[in-house]
Amino acid sequence: MGTLHGRLGPRLLMATALVGGLGMVQAAHAQDAPNFEVYGFAQVDFTQDFNRVDPAWDDALRPSKIPTTQGTFGDNGQTSISVKQSRFGVKAQQDIAGKPLFVQFEFDLFGVGGDAGQTTFRLRHAYGQWGPVLAGQTNSVFMDGDIFPNTIEYWGPTGMVFLRNPQIRYTFGSGPGQFAIAVEKPGNDIDPGNIRTVSPELGANIRGDESLPDLTGHYRYQGDWGHVQLAGILRRVGYETVGATDNKPKNTKLGWGVNATSNIKVGAKDVVHLGVVYGEGIASYMNDGGTDMGPEAATGVTLPLPTPVPPGSLRGDVLPLLGLTAYYDHYWNDQWSSSVGWSMTKVDNTDFQEATAYTYGQYASANLLYTPDPRILIGGELLWGERKDFNDNKGDDLRVQVSFKYSFSSKDFR
């Protein structure tokens, strides 16, 4: 218990106190605020990995974290039991000045970034929407979260756009067709590549240029048959060298992308999830794999470069990326269901990225889920992933996950 308490840290304790206080408010004013809800679930995942991935990512299958050199993370085989998917949230809705106000705050325990591998507070949603205006952190306008399949593995298909991002959004229309536009927080992922080898100091000082927000938009049409969505993004992707005169070398490029997605209903409950995304400099918005910009030799320059690197020999270029997702959710009856599908990401690397740079990833899964009650889910899932590097080295991973999920809502106790 002491070890887990230390890993959770003060952020989770403060968050627990916050939602606990909100829960008491909800209990005291249930009749006055019927649209206030406290919700969440406790989930435990048992994962048996037959190969190995980066130990910080044992509890998720990310192709980008699969080693392409045997033994990088030890012998094959790894067991993990995790509660990181467990979730807690609050949401409220009421009319103000004739327009609906919706507010949501939600977190889980899946550490990422500097907290990767830890069971710790991770903010998912923190936003409000009053009428057509939304402000805060939630799903990117470039993303279609509804194509996420009925799977139990946390990270999900590699080839879909998936990013919860701080944004300011405006939505037009309230019928079956809606158009949304937003400015979103920029977050360039720059790969110095082989610059780190020929000039370590230069490579260490390259930083992303995030001087302008990303511009996103989508059109979505919804019907009894499902929905279709077409989304686009324009963004400034660039880099600069901190500590250097005039911050040079530096460069910027236009990043852009198009994301076409759809859910198609089949029969009473079955759903086909489809998605195809293509663009340049959009890896930051992908669920897994790739980088926005990489180094490329200027025209007429041959490799290898001399040391120090001659001025103008290298430039940054945005990387083309293709992502595909196809899944089928089937319901055997009211209690049993399955989801099966495949996803991929393909990156067109620049000529001066390192040989170990990520270039291709695959993700596939199939499951059987039992839901005796809407608040209870028990299921097993077979997963496979593969990574391919710029130098054509490959690595794959095979694993089985068994999960138990128990959900709750304050509405269940009224």
Question: What are these regions, as identified by a protein language model?
Answer:
Residues 1-30:
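Gram-negative bacterial Sec-dependent N-terminal signal peptides
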Residues 31-58, 62-193, 209-227, 263-267, ...:
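Outer membrane beta-barrel
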Residues 49-53, 114-116, 144-148, 188-193, ...:
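Outer-membrane beta-barrel proteins
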Residues 100-111, 185, 230-236, 337-350, ...:
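Transmembrane beta-strand segments that form the barrel wall of outer-membrane beta-barrel proteins
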Residues 123-125, 165-167, 212-216, 253-261, ...:
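Transmembrane beta-barrel architecture of outer membranes
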Residues 223-358, 414:
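Detector for outer-membrane/organellar transmembrane beta-barrel domains
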Residues 396-414:
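Outer-membrane beta-barrel "beta-signal"
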